[in-house]
C-alpha cells in the first residue's frame, strides 16, 4: 500500500522469529493499493474500511475480512464478510526455488476455499483487472459483464483457479444480469444470458442444479430465436445439468434439463413440465 491516509491499528503474532498472523482495523481514504508480485498499476480506492487478517497454517494461507467496505469511483461496495484460504503447491514452490533461487515466499497455489456473505459482482468485475485473479477468470468476467448481488457464497477448488481439477460452488444471487454470447458458428446455439434474475445454484465439475426466476426480466438465447431476448413479466424454471469430460483437447459434453417451467408476458403464459 504505497499511499493512503486515515487510521490503522494492527496486531502481529510472531513465533520463532516468523510472522504467523496479522490483523488490522482500517479506516483509510485515498488509498493506492498494490498486490504483492504484481506489476500492474496500483488500485486507487477512495475509501477502505473494516477489519482484515492474514494467517499461515502449514500449507494454507488464510485471508479474512469483517465489515469490509470499499469505495472507488462509481463503485460503492457495502460492508461484507469473506474468507479465503489458498493452499500452497509445495512441488511447484520447490521447483521454482530450485530454478531461480527464489525465496519460500514465491509460491504457486494448488486449490482453496472462498466464502462470502455478500458480494457485489458488478463491482468485483470492475475491480478484477487489478485483483490477483487468473487471466482466464478475468477474461470470463469481461465476457459475462455481470451485475447483481451474490449472497451466501461458498466455493472450493482443487488445482489452479484457471483450470481446477475439481470444484464445488453454492450461492444465491439477486438482480443478476449476465451477457449472452453468440456462437462462432451461426448454426449453433450461443451461451445464454439474462437480466434481472434471481438464482439459487449448486454446481461442481460433474454438473449441478439451479432454480432461476425472472421478475420483469428476460432470458437471452443467441441462435434459438430470431430475436434472442424474450421479455417476461414472470418466469421460473428448475435446471439441472451433467458434464461429461471428453478426450484431451475436446470440449466436454453438457446435458441440460429444465423442469417446472412457468412463464407469463404480454403475449402468452403457460407452463412446461420438462424440456
Language-model segments: residues:
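Extended amphipathic, helix-rich lipid-handling scaffolds
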Residues: 1-21, 25-71, 94-186, 199-201, ...
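Hydrophobic/aromatic interaction determinants used to assemble and anchor large protein complexes
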Residues: 66-75, 80-82
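Polar/acidic, low-complexity leader/linker segments enriched in S/T/G and N/D
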Residues: 81-82, 86-88, 101
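Short consensus segments that form the blades of beta-propeller domains
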Residues: 189-191
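Active-site pocket-lining segments that scaffold enzyme catalytic pockets across diverse folds
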Residues: 194-196
